[in-house]
Amino acid sequence: MAVQKNKKSRSKRGMRRSHDSLSTPQLSVDSTSGELHLRHNVTADGFYRGQKVINK
């Protein structure tokens, strides 16, 4: 098992943990259907930026 030789400071611990935070997903409203969707993703209806891109 790995054991550290010297104690890590609070500053170094904080620097390591600075990338661990979670961010909320960026949502957009489609101009055609008014549906919420993730940014840069096609809606469930097949619309992207107001245009139909997927035909079911």
Curated annotation (Swiss-Prot):
Region Disordered, annotated ranges: 1-36
One CC-aspect GO term: large ribosomal subunit
Bias type Polar residues, positions: 21-34
Annotated keywords: Ribonucleoprotein, Ribosomal protein
GO terms, molecular function: structural constituent of ribosome
GO annotation terms (biological process): translation
Keyword Electron transport: no
InterPro entries membership: Ribosomal_bL32, Ribosomal_bL32_bact, Ribosomal_zn-bd
Pfam families to which the protein is assigned, alphabetical: Ribosomal_L32p
Biased composition (Basic residues): 1-16
UniProt key word Chaperone: no
HAMAP family: Ribosomal_bL32
Annotated family: Belongs to the bacterial ribosomal protein bL32 family.
This protein's name: Large ribosomal subunit protein bL32
Organism, scientific name: Shewanella sediminis (strain HAW-EB3)
Primary gene name: rpmF
